[in-house]
Amino acid sequence: MFQSLIAIDYGKARIGISSGQMITKTATPIGTVEAYDGVPNWIELDKIIKCWNPSDIIIGLPLDTQNFETDITKSAKDFAKEVQQRYQRKVHLINEAYSTREARWRLEEVKSKKVSHIKVDALAACVILETWMSEN
């Protein structure tokens, strides 16, 4: 049984993070963790994982519109392996196609005054988590 969940929108400069639960099938943006060339600030990510203590971690897999791997797909897969080893949680990969576009659209719909990268990345993680929850 799933308890709390964390979703991650992997990126080379920032990693968006959201939390959610299967009971309500809702996701909430937590924020972002800075990354340097795809390597996250592990200390910050450690704090988030410790605080939320998720049963599972869902990571967006960057594929193109035809579900082919992109230049960043291998980095995301390597990151997912590191997350699984580091936190000893089940890690699920899900196609994240259009998650950033959907996040931007949602922010524009609520007329967010500042569509920042931080908001977009965290909200993209919500989109990833909501998609995964609807399929599981």
From Swiss-Prot:
Keywords for the protein's UniProt record, in alphabetical order: Cytoplasm, Hydrolase, Nuclease, Ribosome biogenesis
NCBIfam families to which the protein is assigned, alphabetical: RNAse_H_YqgF
Enzyme class: hydrolase
Subcellular location field: Cytoplasm
Record keyword Nucleotidyltransferase present: no
Main location: cytoplasm
BP GO terms, sorted: rRNA 5'-end processing
Entry EC number(s): 3.1.-.-
GO cellular component assignments: cytosol
Task of the protein: Could be a nuclease involved in processing of the 5'-end of pre-16S rRNA.
Source superkingdom: Bacteria
Name of the featured protein: Putative pre-16S rRNA nuclease
Family of the protein in this entry: Belongs to the YqgF nuclease family.
Origin species: Francisella tularensis subsp. tularensis (strain SCHU S4 / Schu 4)
GO molecular function terms listed in the Swiss-Prot or TrEMBL record: nuclease activity
